[in-house]
Curated annotation (Swiss-Prot):
Residues where GTP binds: 93-100, 175-179, 233-236
GO cellular component: cytoplasm; plasma membrane
Localisation per UniProt entry: Cell membrane; Cytoplasm
Summary of the function given for this chain in its UniProt record: Involved in targeting and insertion of nascent membrane proteins into the cytoplasmic membrane. Acts as a receptor for the complex formed by the signal recognition particle (SRP) and the ribosome-nascent chain (RNC).
GO biological process: SRP-dependent cotranslational protein targeting to membrane
UniProt xrefs under InterPro entries: AAA+_ATPase, P-loop_NTPase, Signal_recog_particl_SRP54_hlx, SR_rcpt_FtsY, SRP/SRP_N, SRP54_GTPase_dom, SRP54_N_sf
Taxonomic source organism: Thermoplasma acidophilum (strain ATCC 25905 / DSM 1728 / JCM 9062 / NBRC 15155 / AMRC-C165)
Name used for this protein in its record: Signal recognition particle receptor FtsY
Lineage per the UniProt record: Archaea, Methanobacteriati, Thermoplasmatota, Thermoplasmata, Thermoplasmatales
Amino acid sequence: MFEKLKKKFAEIFHRKKIDPDEVADEIPLKLVEADVSLEAAEDLASLVRNKLKEDTTLDPNEVLSSSILEMMPEYKFDVLNVNKKPFVVLFLGINGTGKTTTIGKFAHYLKRNGKSVVIAAADTFRAGAIEQISLIGREAGTEVIRHDRGSDPSSVAFDAIEHARARNIDYVLIDTAGRMNTNKNLLDEMKKIKRVSKPDLTLLVIDAVSGQDSVNQARMFEENVGYDGVIVTKLDTDARGGSILSIYHDLKKPVLFVCTGQGLDDIMPFDRNWYVRKLIPEPENETA
């Protein structure tokens, strides 16, 4: 996980003599190869240069850690401790990001922590989508509210929320269609679902291996629908590791959860300190 970005940092910082300007010049060149956007890489370079120049005795790895954390503001939100019932979560994302399976993992996470959940199968367009979310809901032990294929997605979301209210269910998770992110009809439908369901939290699901395309997708969703935070999937297959840093820097949105594998249990709240620890090179590899 994140091997490429960690290797790039090692190439830059594993030397006995650190020159702040040389390091700052190298950071953008190397980090764009690991899915860090140029803007994020340049800002990181500037932070590192300034810190090293202010105090030449600082440990380079500590400078790197603190600089990355500075670019990733802490966002305190505990989805398990909310003061509304039902708490409605709307999921956005294009096909292929793992959105539907992520909803199953999210439901499992909530149930594992003693919460009751219902899923709204509001992707009524894609062939097999209703069956897929129904199967995933069954695996997660969660009821799925579904209508026929081609029915109004907003009605599915509305019915799921009413179902939750009537039965005192804690959370409603709404699946949505994920066809091409430039499809105007799809985006208009998502706006309608959001208007009808009035979600308490809107999450964008993007995968870690799509690189800069993930950031472009996220910008499009923000401009057209709006969302509060991000779930990053497929971290177990992400050898580069830079997309999370780019999301924080370029989109000014927090990563709230990450998915680290195929199983229902492979989801966890995102911890920026965990992320930084994964990136920092081991000191014993130091070279001249």
